Amino acid sequence: MKKSRFLLFTSMLLVFWNASFAQQKKQAERSGNPVFPGWYADPEGIIFDNTYWIYPTYSDDYGKPDRSAGFSELQLKTQKNTINPQYLKQTFINAFSSKDLTHWEKHPHVLDIKDVKWAAYSIWAPSITRKDGKYYLFFGANDIQNNNQLGGIGVAVADKPAGPFIDHIGKPLVDKFYNNAQPIDQFVFKDTDGQYYLIYGGWRHCNIGKLNKDFTGFVPFKDSTVFKSITPENYVEGAYMITRKGKYYLMWSEGNWTGPDYSVAYAMSDSPLGPFKRIGKVLQQDPAIATGAGHHSVIHVPNTDDWYIVYHRRPLNTTDGNHREVCIDRMYFDKNGFILPVKITNEGVEKRVLKR
């Protein structure tokens, strides 16, 4: 009798262990949200050579503080302009790479202000592209409040997506307010005809400009203007653009970045220059999961109609505006080409290895 009970108990343990292992394996096949630890924001997601990459803003310390090694006299002087001491921590960019969306490798300080002499703090919202075998990382720096301050949008270059990135032109690419747009939150967009554009802007204004061939400046439009305003209704910051089936989708963030209602909306047009009429929100908080879901990017899997939205959000156990995490969820379109509201999840997305 004791032997039978022992066998029954052992069998039950095996069943429980197998079920637990199967559940763990099932969970391991998904990314989970957040996809990697740390307080990060404004993530740029992209694919290079069958590898997923994410370039976020360093939002706050998570465990051991991460810092740049030191600052020049010019950088220390420029740091006195900051409107928020928290921004003084944001002097570098860390990157993350993955082969399958579930296991991420950290690449520390792919960009650091030691390699950008005019940049001193508020290194924000990186955007990256590859051109002619080089990688170009666009970034905001110094959070300028007026045209008399040093800073704006910069561009750095490297031979590899993991850097190290060094200053490309030795000065900001955009260093002033045009059309009342603060020079932050830049996105480099390659059109189907090969033309590269810079789309950017804070303070509720969004601009677009045509980049020249070597990314050292801009090519004026036919009317001689360098930047055109494409600001849609309710725009705040965080511009992003994709194309799908001949349509241009301008996406942006609305609301206050420190609050629960931070969100993403979008518009559609037949041209990257607009006009863009707001359609509605595509990403926002779920009070049961997380708040402040915003400042996003989009990953499109080549040769498919599969799309992922990469974004930051704030966990429910904190109201600190700087405590943001990078998450990934699926993004879908309806039969008419409109973006369906994204369901934010704790599970994240399924493991996916890119085909060679």
List where the protein language model places each region:
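Bacterial Sec-dependent N-terminal signal peptides
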Residues: 1-25
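Carbohydrate-active catalytic/glycan-binding domains of CAZyme proteins
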Residues: 21-356
